[in-house]
Design a protein with these regions (language model features):
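Bacterial N-terminal signal peptides
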Residues: 7-18
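Acidic/His/Gly-enriched intrinsically disordered linker/tail segments
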Residues: 195-202, 226, 245-397
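N-terminal secretory signal peptides that target proteins for export/translocation
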Residues: 1-4
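Compositionally biased alpha-helical segments
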Residues: 20-149, 154-157
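Short, flexible beta-strand-to-coil junctions
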Residues: 52-54, 174-178, 337-340
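Juxtacatalytic substrate-recognition/specificity segment
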Residues: 113-250, 358-362
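Flexible, glycine-rich phosphate/dinucleotide-binding loops
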Residues: 46, 180, 267
Length: 397
């Protein structure tokens, strides 16, 4: 009897895991049409499918599929949610170490169309000029390391957990800054994330000069000697789940998270997370490590009330970007590392996943504390690290 129960249990576990292990699947709609595709995400009653035939992502209503496919999609969502729930309980990483010898595959080279496509394990790089495998490998390491960092953070951002075999994040590379700007890149930027609903996770656009590539003869060589915080920042946006852009989190947390990853000391495929506190403080209050970059807010910061700051429209947040990004970094770091544990930020992120937003979600973060008490705790924590934050009176209280 015991053996029968054990076999039944094992079979049940295998059946539960099967949908998670499958790659592409033949989906059938109610009219009998078939499509070979892989799920990239599901939101409410819409599923995004990466179609094998053309490599593009399409959004479809769940209702158009036959019952067995709808059940498969629901099971896929359930498995993703289980993975997210487990990730919340993982320890905070101290070191992200990425393999430097990553495999690069050339999937398309079309001189006439100026389209050259390269695959690393989790990224698709689409460039308007030919690059060697070795050059792509050099800069792809930073992309892969950033994704691994986001995957290891116990914040359950599912986009960082989707295997490259199912969905590669798209990166558009441009030979010239002029071409980058013509295609929508901000003139003063070194890279940008553009959210596109029908393009899966959106795209990141980067001019080659931002990757440290220099033209030598008819080819390119990698000669990057500086620090690149813009690219990890934009890559984090590409990997951040949509729920974390909801009101109450959009701005202070979505940008604070991107800043947190970007300022982490990085070298040769390694993010040294254990060294983050000094890097966070130096970047937010000064000009960063070695005087490169930084928000330079100073050691005494006069801030809006916490409630007004967290609930301000995103357009207002970006209108004063340098200050708000720096303060967002300090506050995000507080919730990650300066409370007794991460239970409050975890509960807040879970609430966002469940559909809460705005003040309703922030009440979960406060966990019974008043806004005045929350401000006092943040101020006290940072004062002990040499940063004095003074919050103004709220205009909405």
């Amino acid at each position: 009897m015991y053996m029968m129960k054990l076999v039944t249990l094992l079979l049940g576990c295998l059946l539960m895991l099967a949908p998670c292990e499958l790659g592409a699947r033949m989906f059938t709609d109610v009219d009998g049409s078939k499509i070979d595709a892989t799920i990239t995400k599901v939101e409410k009653d819409t599923v995004s499918l990466l179609v094998k035939a053309d490599g593009k992502v399409y959004d479809s209503r769940l209702s158009i599929f036959r019952p067995n496919d709808r059940n498969y999609i629901r099971e896929w969502v359930r498995r993703q949610e289980l993975e997210a729930a487990y990730n919340f309980d993982d320890p905070w990483p101290t070191l992200i170490n990425t393999d430097l010898d990553i495999e690069i595959e050339i999937t398309e080279e079309d001189e006439e169309k100026k389209r050259f496509v390269y695959h690393s394990p989790n990224y698709e790089f689409i460039c308007d000029v030919r690059l060697s495998k070795n050059v792509v490998k050099k800069f792809a390491t930073l992309f892969e390391a950033t994704r691994e960092y986001c995957r290891m953070l116990p914040i359950a951002t599912l986009k960082a957990h989707v295997p490259g075999a199912q969905f590669r994040n798209k990166i558009l590379l441009f030979e010239s800054k002029a071409s980058y700007v013509r295609n929508g890149g901000p003139p003063s930027s070194a890279g940008v994330f553009i959210s596109r609903g029908r393009q899966g996770n959106g795209i990141v656009m980067v001019p080659l000069e931002s990757l440290g590539l220099k033209k030598v003869g008819s080819g390119y060589m990698y000669d990057y000697k500086g620090e690149n915080k813009v690219l990890p920042h934009e890559l984090v946006h590409q990997l951040t789940d949509r729920e974390y852009y909801r009101s109450g989190a959009r701005g202070w947390f979505s940008e604070g998270l991107a800043e947190y990853v970007a300022v982490t000391p990085y070298r040769s495929g390694k993010f040294m997370v254990r060294s983050n506190l000094s890097a966070v403080k130096a970047y937010a209050t000064e000009y960063g490590k070695k005087g490169k970059g930084g928000r330079a807010l100073g050691d005494e910061i006069i801030a809006p009330s916490l409630k007004d700051y967290m609930l301000q429209p995103y357009s207002e947040f970006t209108a004063n970007a340098n200050f708000n990004y720096g303060l967002g970094l300090l506050i995000t770091n507080y919730y990650f590392h300066m409370e007794e544990d991460r239970s409050n930020i975890t509960a807040f992120l879970r609430a966002l996943k469940r559909g809460k937003q705005g003040e309703e979600a922030l009440r979960v973060l406060l966990n019974g504390r008043s806004w005045d008490e929350m401000e006092e705790q943040i101020t006290k924590a940072w004062r002990s690290r040499g940063v004095k934050i003074t919050f103004r009176e709220s205009v909405s209280r």
